[in-house]
Amino acid sequence: MLPARELLGDMLMELKRPAEALKEYEASQQREPNRYRGLYGASQAAAQSGDRDKARHYFSKLIELAGSGDVRPEMENARRYLASN
């Protein structure tokens, strides 16, 4: 079962409202920290809303938690973002 605010963040991203989605992902992280899906959502929302510092923070945390051997597409995206920003 996914946290409600994480799901709301996902819906807001689908509606192209990343700044609002970021707030929901951050609220979800307060209650259920270090969820892979929530961290990735927060990093994407931050990047799409132009908040590079938060995007870097969440992408870095995602990589730290998942480990260097993780090859999921989200991790490749995180590494690319950090390499170029």
Residue ranges and their predicted role:
Residues 7, 41-44, 74-76, 81:
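"A position-specific structural signal for the A-helix of alpha-solenoid helical repeats
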